Amino acid sequence: SMHAIRLCHQKGIKVGMRFTMTQDNAHELPALLGLMEDEGVDKFYLSHLNYAGRGNINRKDDVILKTTRWAMDLLFDTCWDYTQRGLHKEFVTGNNDADGVYLLFWVRRHYPQLADHMRAKLAQWGGNSSGVNIANIDNLGNVHPDTFWWHYSLGNVKQRSFPDIWRDTTDPLMAGLKASPRSIKGRCGECNY
C-alpha cells in the first residue's frame, strides 16, 4: 500500500488513507496518523465499523465507547495541530452520525469561544446525507439511498435516468430523506442534536 501511495505522489495524484477501527487494531491509530504526516498523505478517513455487508462478521470486534472517544479525541487533536502548523490535510469520519455532536463537545471543552460557530456550521452541514448527497448504484443498475441500503431500491438506471429517480419524492422513503428537517423517531429523534 505504501508503495502505491508513493507512486501516486510521484504522479501528482492526491492520496488518502482509510482505517476501519476494531478492538484488534485501534492501538495502531496513532502510528497511522504519524505515517500520514511522514508520507505527506492528503486525507485520512476514519471509518467506524458498520455492521452492513462484510462488516457484520466483525460485530464482535467493534470497539467500546471509551476507545471510540479516545480515537475521536486523537483525530480532533491531530487535525487541530495540523491546522495550527499550516498543514492542509483532510480528516473525515464515517458511519457514525454522532461524530459531529462529539466534535461540538470537543470544541466546547477546548475552544468554548468557537462553540456557537461550530454548532452553526454543523447545522448548516445538516448531518446524514443518505438520499441527498450520497447515492449507490449497484452492479445491476439499481439505485439505493446510500451504500448501506442494498435492501431498498428506488429504481433502475436501465429503465429511468438517474436524475429522474433521484429527484422523485413520490417514494415515501425519498420524501422523508429529502425533507428538511427530517422527521426522525425513536432514540435519534429524542436527541437535541
Task: Briefly describe each language-model feature range.
Residues 2-140, 150-159:
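Radical SAM enzyme [4Fe-4S]-AdoMet core and its adjacent flexible, acidic
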